[in-house]
């Protein structure tokens, strides 16, 4: 039985690598944010606005516990999920946890392109975006680094890099 949790900051490649890794292992892939949106028929942004951060984080925790009941699955968490309640401890207890570590410059490049799809980043100038990323990583590092495995996910720009990363991740997890 395998249950793998991919954690990391937004833009780290949790969904990109998670889908490819699940395909390689021939197991389902669950993106926790997508799962929440399907269950509640609202975007994460709408739920966050409607319930506030505390309400959203509680809902996220409950949904994390729900998806953790599935076996033989790759789960990507939201970027903040490991940082609240006992979520990181829970994931470490119920599966294999991987922190997708990405250099801030790489995150900046990825998120700069994807700003329109991420409401929290809209309207940020380049220098503000870089400061935002660095500050968030500093706050979240104590949680992310509790993962059982730390994996460099800087190179996910094309199919070959993704395939190579999947192979490296499979070797790291000894699967």
UniProtKB/Swiss-Prot annotation:
Gene Ontology terms: cellular component: cytosol
Family matches, as SUPFAM superfamilies: P-loop containing nucleoside triphosphate hydrolases
Enzyme class: transferase
Catalytic activity entry: shikimate + ATP = 3-phosphoshikimate + ADP + H(+)
Cofactor dependence: Mg(2+)
Entry binding sites for substrate: 33, 57, 79, 140
Pathway: Metabolic intermediate biosynthesis; chorismate biosynthesis; chorismate from D-erythrose 4-phosphate and phosphoenolpyruvate: step 5/7
Positions bound to Mg(2+): 15
EC number: 2.7.1.71
Entry's cofactor comment: Binds 1 Mg(2+) ion per subunit.
Gene Ontology MF: a single term: ATP binding
Record key words, sorted: Amino-acid biosynthesis, Aromatic amino acid biosynthesis, ATP-binding, Cytoplasm, Kinase, Magnesium, Metal-binding, Nucleotide-binding, Transferase
InterPro entries: P-loop_NTPase, Shikimate/glucono_kinase, Shikimate_kinase/TSH1
Residues the record lists as binding ATP: 11-16, 118
Subcellular compartments: Cytoplasm
Subunit structure, as described in the record: Monomer.
Family, per entry: Belongs to the shikimate kinase family.
Role according to the record: Catalyzes the specific phosphorylation of the 3-hydroxyl group of shikimic acid using ATP as a cosubstrate.
Alphabetized HAMAP family for the sequence: Shikimate_kinase (MF_00109)
NCBIfam families per UniProt: PRK13949.1
Protein's recorded name: Shikimate kinase
Organism per entry: Bacteroides thetaiotaomicron (strain ATCC 29148 / DSM 2079 / JCM 5827 / CCUG 10774 / NCTC 10582 / VPI-5482 / E50)
The encoding gene: aroK
């Amino acid at each position: 039985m395998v249950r793998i949790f991919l954690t990391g900051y937004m833009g780290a490649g949790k969904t990109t690598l998670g889908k490819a890794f699940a395909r390689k292992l021939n197991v389902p892939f669950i993106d926790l944010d997508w799962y929440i949106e399907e269950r509640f028929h609202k975007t994460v942004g709408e739920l966050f606005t409607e319930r506030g951060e505390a309400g959203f984080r509680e809902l996220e925790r409950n949904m994390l516990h729900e998806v953790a009941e599935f076996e033989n699955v790759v789960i990507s968490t939201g970027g903040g999920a490991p940082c609240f309640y006992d979520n990181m401890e829970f994931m470490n207890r119920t599966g294999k946890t991987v922190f997708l570590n990405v250099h801030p410059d790489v995150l900046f490049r990825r998120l700069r392109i994807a700003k329109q799809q991420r409401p929290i980043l809209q309207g940020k100038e380049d220098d503000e975006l870089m400061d935002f990323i660095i500050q968030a990583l500093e706050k979240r590092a104590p949680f992310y680094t509790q993962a059982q495995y730390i994996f460099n996910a800087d190179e996910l720009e094309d199919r070959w890099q993704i395939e190579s990363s999947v192979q490296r991740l499979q070797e790291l997890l000894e699967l």
